[in-house]
Structure formats: structure tokens, C-alpha cells
């Protein structure tokens, strides 16, 4: 057995880890799907639980020696149920995509019709995109946003549901900044005999604390990731109140699409759920929303347009067409200035997904650092400076302005440090 520490045994990997730690410390993370986990979550994920194979479920394993991994999985399950007020939870999905696959398979066989939000309008790959399993093994029909309000077009959802009679309607998105009306989705599902699957991956942390309406009791199945606003390890989870669906979900996860669960990740999920049950986490999610509103307001003051006119959650989609610049160029310029985000298509974007006409911004990670509204207003002003420089330079950006902004980013990062003891 190799007993050397990582630095001495594999300095190349250690160097990359050190560089990534430096990046996280010295850049302001604005990618809406990312967050910063606690040392306790990292300790659980980096524990000896990684050594244990545990096919099956607690007390029903196909391997011996599962007494202690059973404890952490039961803790994760019970805490998830408490957190979201539901009867059943499966914490084994390795990702949100696998959670969605199992949820769909638990309801409808291959070839069935599903109705989900178009990727081009803010949906997720797994909601029916042609390049994804959901658009290949299912007959996927896509709804979108109202052209004027840029909110979910429920008239279109209803019309498509009546026409295609889907087995599943999917509610949820990856780039949608407004509250989702689950009751309206339920009404449409009931009218056509469809099951409602809510993918709350992006806003699960807000749901946990009442900062976003809960999908329950409207949803038949709820899927989520365990990172993003929930601030846990990267992974997935499936929730339901239906006992029969719970049994089907379990069998679709194992042995359906996965083998052994990642017990070290499940241990980290359990820790994150305990954190999310604390009063401090509610304060955190409230601040996430306040910060998003503050950031959006400053961007609008700076002449940028927010898709749908604002935000109700943790993210916003910034339309750059008025500046005649691309999301790709803007993403690169912001990163050079120490502000990390991602290019993102806007509704009906004429540019390719690799170029785009927008960027997506989110507040969860920087809020974890301690950023408040004042700090996010400062961040917003920095973003506007960089965007204006990209526009003035025909997309190239201005190295001098980026360097000036980076100094101010450094000052904010020093004011709100992370991982000081690592």
C-alpha cells in the first residue's frame, strides 16, 4: 500500500489541486450551478467510505460489511425527507441526469412522449434535448417561453399537452430566473393524464428553506442535484410521496442504471443535508436571493438587459445583444478579470451554443463566501465595466481595464476569504 502523501507521490496532481484552490480563493465564482462546500462536507467525501462497495439499499445489500455505510445512507435519506417534507428519498443517483433518467423510466417506457422545456429557452439537456438520452429514447416535445414576458408559456404547455398526450410533463430549468407555478403544471397534467416530474436541481436549496415554493404536493416525482443552491457534494437525489413510485425508482436506480452507490458521496450528502436543516442555512438562502436582486438591478442600471426583466431566485440570464458582443467573448473577458461565469443562449438565440448572445450569472458561491448586497453591487459595476470594454473593443476586451477590475476582485476575495486552513 502506498503510504506517501499526495504531494510527494504525485506532485503533478497536487500541483493542479493547489492551482484550483488558488483559483477558487482569488476568483469570484458567478456560475449559477456551482457552490463552495464546507470542510465538513469535504471531509466526509474524502473519507474511508470511498472504499466500500454497497450494491443494494440499507439492510438489503449484496455485499457484507455494510453496517456502517448503511448508517450514513439512512441518515441521508431521513434528513432529505425532513428537509423537503416528503415520504421517500433515494440518495444514490450519481448525478442529476441519472436522477432524471431513473425518474422517467419509473413512469414511462422507452418510446413514450415527454413534454419538457426547450434547451433553447432555458431548459436542461435531460428535459428532451435531441442530443441527450431524453430526446433519443423518448418522443420529446418541447415547450418554451412567452415571447413578450419571457416566462413559461402555459398556453403553449397546455396546447402541446392536449395535442400530444405526454406520459410525463417536466417542470424545471437550468437558466430560468422566475418562480415556477407547480400548481398550474399539475392542473395541465391532470387534464391529460400525465405524471409531473419536477427537476428542482437549481433551486433545491431555496425550496428547502421556503425561499421558493415547494414542488410538493403537486409533483409525482421530484429530482434534484445535491450541489448548486443545496451546497453539498456533486450528486443527485429523487423524492416522492408515492410508495409505488418509490419502489419503481429504487429498482430503476439499482439495478436499472447504476451498480454500487458512491458511499463517500452519500456520506457528504448526509452532512450537507444536516447543514441545510440549520437556521444558518435559511439565512444563507435569503441572502442568495437578495444578492441576486441587487446584482440584477446594478446590471440594468448599467444598460444591460435581464431576460424576463429580473430574477426571483439565485440566477439571471444577461442578454448582450444590445452591446453586439457574444457570450463567449464576455465569458473570457470576465474570467481574465477574475469573474467566472458561463456563456449561455438567450431565448431564440441566433448564435450557436458555443458562441451565444448571453451569459448566465448566479449568486450561491459568492454568498457562501459572505458577500452581501453591497458586495454584489460592486461586482455588478465591475461586470458592466468589463462588458463595456468588450463592446468598445469589438469583442477583444481591454487588458488594462481587466487588470484594474482584477485588483478590485482581489480586494473583495481578501475581504471574504475561503479555505484559509487548507
Swiss-Prot record:
Residue numbers binding (6S)-5,6,7,8-tetrahydrofolate: 119, 123-125, 244, 352-354
Cofactor(s) in the UniProt record: pyridoxal 5'-phosphate
Keywords: Amino-acid biosynthesis, Cytoplasm, One-carbon metabolism, Pyridoxal phosphate, Transferase
Localization of this protein: Cytoplasm
Cellular component GO terms held in the UniProt record: cytosol
Reactions mediated catalytically: (6R)-5,10-methylene-5,6,7,8-tetrahydrofolate + glycine + H2O = (6S)-5,6,7,8-tetrahydrofolate + L-serine
Disulfide bonds listed in the record: none
Residues the record lists as N6-(pyridoxal phosphate)lysine modifications: 228
Main location: cytoplasm
GO BP: any one term: tetrahydrofolate interconversion
Site note Plays an important role in substrate specificity, residues: 227
InterPro entries for this protein: PyrdxlP-dep_Trfase, PyrdxlP-dep_Trfase_major, PyrdxlP-dep_Trfase_small, Ser_HO-MeTrfase, Ser_HO-MeTrfase-like, Ser_HO-MeTrfase_PLP_BS, SHMT-like_dom
EC annotation from Swiss-Prot or TrEMBL: 2.1.2.1
Associated pathway: One-carbon metabolism; tetrahydrofolate interconversion; Amino-acid biosynthesis; glycine biosynthesis; glycine from L-serine: step 1/1
Single GO molecular function: pyridoxal phosphate binding
Pfam families: SHMT (PF00464)
NCBIfam families linked: PRK00011.1 (NF000586)
Subunit structure: Homodimer.
Family per similarity comment: Belongs to the SHMT family.
Function: Catalyzes the reversible interconversion of serine and glycine with tetrahydrofolate (THF) serving as the one-carbon carrier. This reaction serves as the major source of one-carbon groups required for the biosynthesis of purines, thymidylate, methionine, and other important biomolecules. Also exhibits THF-independent aldolase activity toward beta-hydroxyamino acids, producing glycine and aldehydes, via a retro-aldol mechanism.
Name of the protein this chain belongs to: Serine hydroxymethyltransferase
Source taxonomy: Bacteria, Pseudomonadati, Pseudomonadota, Alphaproteobacteria, Magnetococcales
